Amino acid sequence: MAATPDREKALEAALAQIDKQFGKGSIMRLGDDTRAPIEVIPTGSIALDVALGIGGLPRGRVVEIYGPESSGKTTVALHAVANAQRAGGIAAFIDAEHALDPDYAAKLGVDTDALLVSQPDTGEQALEIMDMLVGSGSLDIVVIDSVAALVPRAEIEGEMGDSHVGLQARLMSQALRKITGRLSQTKTTAIFINQLREKIGVFFGSPETTTGGKALKFYASVRIDVRRIQTLKEGADSVGNRTKAKIVKNKMAPPFKIAEFDIIYGQGISREGGIIDMGVEHGIIKKSGSWFTYDGDQLGQGMENSRRFLRDNPELAQELERLIKEKLGVGVVKTEEDSPKLKAVDG
């Protein structure tokens, strides 16, 4: 039905009133193209950034990272914190598990002096602190580690063995209803780290489930399943893990993409290893035998030497990362100058 001039005039008056009362941009036509591009925080793994489809974790959204114990969940979150801080952002870490290692966080690039840390006594306290920080409008990223450790006050104050069915799920549901809108308004990324549990009596399908009820599954714009798939060795020594991350939910881009990357003990995600893997996969870096070359110059013999070479030459690593993202059309970051060609590391 065609809009008459009177109806059009009435609509424009209503839109003007909405903008005046609730702020400009409260309502708009989808075709106006006034939506800002999605801002992201890089994860530290180029493979994971590409799998997310937008170049990193979205600003102003809820992100859930879950998986088995020691799979790399906190490592991924801390890398995102470090990247947010490098961009001049303010980060908070709500350590409900009381297990944050400041030395390890510093090795991953986190500015521990500037990091806001809270070790709350109850789940209510943790989520209230988070709400107040987000409401300040000054925060860029907040991490909650972990949902399983957000124990309701009634459970802590009660007797051992008391039943508190659904208490944590109700707490999470109430908190997320309140916080989600504020996250969007303040462009704050909230990362909830979660643990896995097994449902009893499941014979078909996966018995695995996450803690905290269903609210987080609904409110999360991105859900990442992180698993350790292989132990990395140098000789007889274990030096790290090969990690697989599956994007099981993504409201920003197509879901179900898979990324693989290396986590080195004491160092975190190997950014350089990810660049080499993705570079070879997409034909930017050539592999001949055990040698890796870029643009006719040898990077090194073997993965470890090539990784060390890129670590020693960050300009080249940045150029390769830019070329890979440019080729895939994801999170392109332009640089003014190409890096010089450099001498390779022999193995």
UniProtKB/Swiss-Prot annotation:
SMART domains: AAA. Pfam families: RecA, RecA_C. Its main location: cytoplasm. Keywords: ATP-binding, Cytoplasm, DNA damage, DNA recombination, DNA repair, DNA-binding, Nucleotide-binding, SOS response. Belongs to the RecA family. This is Protein RecA. It comes from Paenarthrobacter aurescens (strain TC1). GO terms for molecular function: ATP binding; ATP hydrolysis activity; ATP-dependent DNA damage sensor activity; damaged DNA binding; single-stranded DNA binding. GO terms for biological process: DNA recombination; DNA repair; SOS response. CDD domains: RecA. It comes from the Bacteria.
